[in-house]
Design a protein with these regions (language model features):
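Loop and turn regions of beta-sandwich accessory domains that flank beta-strands and are enriched
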Residues: 1-175
Length: 175
């Protein structure tokens, strides 16, 4: 991301298709900042333990918005998790950071099947310049990537403008 500003609120929307009926139980999603810290959005438990993805075995996330201000925890949701959910860890951990740099979505897949994932970061900053990425609008920095096998997949967004994160929300679509 090349825009300047300090994060005051960050959300992320994710669309993910695992390609496997019970695929979510094999996935863990983390957002990594350009400054080395990360937030876990949600995790699977291939042994059937809970909590994970609302205890659901569904394989996909559709227009799933990870937002600290949501009243529903991701683990209390139901597949395909459309709409806003609180992530496993707080996105406010990014508050006060600069928005500028390369953001990565880390997908850990432990079952060997592939899929696709795309994400869009929606951020509010304390910058005096207008926010080019208003919540749930268009024009957000986003990325899409396919994953396969038992591997880790990174999706990166480059933000080059200076600024500090004050709130971070993430939308993930697993398709």
């Amino acid at each position: 991301i090349t825009d300047a500003g300090t994060i005051t609120d960050l959300n992320i929307m994710v669309n993910l298709d695992h390609g496997y009926e019970n695929g979510l139980r094999y996935l863990t999603l983390q957002l990594l900042s350009p400054y080395g810290n990360s937030v876990e959005l949600g995790h699977g438990d291939q042994n059937g333990g809970s909590p994970y993805w609302g205890g659901q075995d569904g394989g996909n996330l559709y227009n799933t918005v990870f937002d600290d201000e949501s009243s529903t925890l991701i683990y209390d949701g139901t597949a395909p998790f459309a709409g806003p959910y609180q992530p496993d860890a707080s996105l406010s951990d990014f508050d006060g950071q600069s928005i500028t740099g390369t953001w990565q979505l880390l997908v850990t897949n432990t079952n060997g099947n592939g899929g696709t994932v795309e994400f869009t970061i929606m951020v509010e900053t304390d910058s005096s310049t207008p926010n080019p990425y208003p919540d749930y609008g268009t024009g957000y920095p986003s990325g899409e990537e396919s994953f396969s096998g038992n591997d880790l997949t990174f999706i990166e967004l480059d933000i080059t403008d200076a600024g500090t994160i004050t709130d971070l929300n993430i939308m993930v679509n697993l398709d």
